[in-house]
From Swiss-Prot:
InterPro entries xref list: Ribosomal_Su5_D2-typ_SF (IPR020568), Ribsml_uS5_D2-typ_fold_subgr (IPR014721), RNase_P (IPR000100)
Any GO BP annotation: tRNA 5'-leader removal
Reactions accelerated catalytically: Endonucleolytic cleavage of RNA, removing 5'-extranucleotides from tRNA precursor
Keywords: Endonuclease, Hydrolase, Nuclease, RNA-binding, tRNA processing
Record gene name: rnpA
Organism of provenance: Ligilactobacillus salivarius (strain UCC118)
Protein name (database record): Ribonuclease P protein component
Pfam families in the record: Ribonuclease_P (PF00825)
Similarity section: Belongs to the RnpA family.
Record bears the keyword tRNA processing: yes
Superkingdom of origin: Bacteria
E.C. number: 3.1.26.5
Coiled coil, from the record: none
Amino acid sequence: MRKSYRVKKEAEFQTVFTQGQSCANRQFVVYMLEKPDQKHFRVGISVGKKIGNAVARNWVKRRIRQSLTELKPQLKQDCDFLVIARPTVAYMSMAEVKEHLKHVLKLAKVLGE
């Protein structure tokens, strides 16, 4: 996923947190903020320190990023997303990460078929 598809700045994260809608399952929390003037979606990924050491957190972020890249054609394009991983994600395989992320994105009504 290219860097132009990422939410990076603290102010942008806070805007999505405060003004966006949230949806969650046991593995992920997703905040979504619609931005009609935006050409493509952007994603911010947050993995807290409760999830292992730095190696484990980076592993989880890579898995989430890869899953989102594979789901890219189905995602709503005019939104900013924040994906927050919960501690159970550290023990999941790539297929499970993608499946649970797909589930929470469907709940948030941002994933088409």
